[in-house]
Amino acid sequence: MLMEVKKIKFSYQDKPFIEELSVKFKKNKITSIIGPNGSGKSTLLMLLSRIYKAKDGTITLNDKNVWDYKIKEFAKNVAVVHQKNQIYGDLDVKTIVGYGRLPYLSYHQNLSEEDYQIIDWAIATTNLKEYENRLLANLSGGQQQRVWLAMALAQKTPILLLDEPTTYLDVKYQIEILK
């Protein structure tokens, strides 16, 4: 098992939102969280990715509390694509996808040949090769979503947390992503 949530509680402005939630995410399994708008799916992703911290309960990764990991070590295990990404608009696709390799670099270390191969693989996997030198701001919403997916894939993590990963994508790409 990779990730486990045990009896977590989370509140927004002292109003209980998630109460006593427990769930296990097993290795080599795809787990989908389905529910109506406002039911806490994105909040759970924020908790799993350490953006929010649960009021009570624990979230473990390989039997270790997620908060006990250093940021880079956590990022080597968990990649996240959020529902809304509004940053890096003035950077090109290849640079943004390359940010997925940052957890593996030391301060001021350059990308290796292996890193560039992984970046090229992530770009090809998400069908972005023809856009790799374009600025993110000049891409459609669906193309931008694929850039975020490529960046997460470039992290080469055992866990991918995807919040509405097919938003803005054409049906063709929705099917490919879900495969």
What are these regions (language model features)?
Residues 149-150, 177:
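Hydrophobic anchor residue at the start of the ABC signature
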Residues 98, 113-131, 156:
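Conserved ABC ATPase "signature" region
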Residues 49:
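Helix-to-loop junction immediately C-terminal to a conserved catalytic motif
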Residues 57-65, 74:
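Conserved ABC transporter NBD signature motif
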Residues 34-36:
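The feature captures the beta-strand-to-loop junction immediately N-terminal to the Walker
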Residues 160-164:
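Catalytic Walker B motif of ABC-type/P-loop ATPase nucleotide-binding domains
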Residues 109-110, 135-139, 143:
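Conserved ABC ATPase signature
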